[in-house]
Amino acid sequence: NKSLKERATIIQRRLIADDRGWFLKAITGTEEGIPTHTGEVYLTMGKFGQAKGGHYHPEAVEWFTIIEGSAILKLEDMETHERLDIEMSLVKAITVFIPNNVAHVVVNNGDKDFILLAYTDKLYDPKDTITYEIKG
């Protein structure tokens, strides 16, 4: 039998940071022992007064949950251009499902940084992330 030290795995992750905040993938979908069909679990932080996102995915769907701070999730359907703003915070304790072809941006509307926990059903593909600015 293998020891716990041999069976447990510590995986170094890459923290990506810029003026708006930071981004960290917790599960990339390529880990040993992960099911063959998976997506990605990630955390992202948005600094006070900043927005994160501003894109849509033709293929992937996502689920967003704020785990610290508060934000407005702005959505726009790329086919109908219907728009929806959703207030999110730890106090509200909601998870929002974002269908494919729906543009999304998360705008910090609080007095401190927000942290968002997200899941996407696909592995990251830059061809499936189309920049789009939701106006207003």
Language model segments and positions:
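Non-catalytic, conserved peripheral segments adjacent to functional cores
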Residues: N1-T95, D111-G136
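Conserved SET/PR-domain catalytic core that frames the SAM/AdoMet-binding pocket
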Residues: A93-A103
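Asparagine-centered strand-capping/turn motif at beta-strand->loop junctions
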Residues: V106-N109
